[in-house]
Amino acid sequence: MVLIVRILEKNGKKLVNKCYPAFSVSNRKRKFAPFPTLYWLACPETDAMVSNLERQGLIGDLELKINSGQYELERQRFRQQHFRYIHERNRLLYDLSLQHQLDINIEDNCVSWLHNAQRLKGIGGIDVAPLIDANSDEMHLKCLHAHYAHYLGTQDNIIGEWVHELLMRKK
């Protein structure tokens, strides 16, 4: 079971769910597993449009764009966005008042395990270890849905912003 922390809407239409960074794997025992995706597209139409962009090869196109050398400022922003995302996820994970509000009790060893399992996973589950080196050669992308949901939820995701611009042009 995924725990919804907040629902983001526009014009009465559910756009994005903000999720707790762990999900229950058992109803009988308080067992939790990492759920690294904080922002989840909740609108079926938007989800379908982003799926269509992925089928058309946009992930590869955007990887080429961000790695082309022409977008160094965007590249630096993207690196920073991953680390802000990890920080936000960790803050939620350790927020005891939120755990109380959601009526869950995550034991310390479970929090530690979840933190270690997710500490180097950025937006869309991307391994950020190579991003620690500011001169790393190549950035990779996964799941435009995660990037776009993160953009809609925070306005802080360059890949999601590019996806948004493409979707607005297609309307």
Tell me what each language-model feature is.
Residues 1-171:
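Preference for intrinsically disordered or flexible, low-complexity segments
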